[in-house]
Amino acid sequence: MTSLVDDYFDDVISRLVALKRDARAGIERAIEAILGVVQSDGRVFVFGTGHSHVIAEETHYRAGGLAITVPILTGATRVKDGAVAGTVYERTPGIVGPILERYGVGRTDLLIIVSNSGVNAAP
């Protein structure tokens, strides 16, 4: 009988192999887009609502990191006021416009949107 640990690692490995096969072209396009931003002295903004904002937080540069990353963090679309309030805000059409204006996302910048479901008005 295999152990749960073996089952876990086998599952993770099979998912990584599938990701490499299925998402390679998209990942390569993302790399090229980020490289273009670096070469044009732009910034990489990352935005997510609800729990997806954690990904944006993780991109914030640290010592030795890529200092062109800018997480877009706003209380209205995070879960800090509770999941119900966050859900209402992230489903409000137009809520992101003023947020992006405040951050000054420009033509040479890249905006990465993180979404668990892809169904909300925000972003």
Model-predicted regions and their roles:
Residues 1-22:
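Generic N-terminal amphipathic, Lys/Arg-enriched alpha-helix
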Residues 4, 26-29, 51:
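Short, contiguous, pocket-lining structural segments
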Residues 8, 15, 30-33, 95:
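A ubiquitous structural signal for well-ordered alpha-helices
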Residues 11, 26-29, 122:
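Charged catalytic carboxylate motif
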